[in-house]
């Protein structure tokens, strides 16, 4: 027989969420989630509800994204939304108008839309203390055109090693220098982007 739809318990919490806020939160964090059988809590988006803010977090222990949106609700709680229903929810939400109704308990979440109702099992466990790894009072601040930076990374990444996808970024003198190379095929790429930078010269490496 077809599986029964999970029922939320009497201690469930309910609220209304703005569609754009939920879609943006999923879009900006889902790419940073993991596929880790040993640490399943990282395989979803951590969502924290507070009276004046809604926080979305995604991490795979190598990269971390935290997205905050202002909101007004009376619920204080948190849960971990699995990646698959998050993607499904995002697709369905694009066809919605303003707000959706949501309810959740310690095991399941229910999203009620105009023509759909999505029920999913939440990931159980304690999410890592992500605030502990976010630097506070960082003296280095850079302001750069996002599209220009993204396009520069895409162009340079073509010449990175396909195994590591490593790109080197040097920031100094109001310039960002992007570099990548694949020694096996004797190819390399460099690109310089203008920026506004306040801080000491730094050099970092990351996966493209």
Q: Where are these predicted regions, by residue range?
A:
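Structural preference for solvent-exposed beta-strand-turn elements
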Residues: 1-208
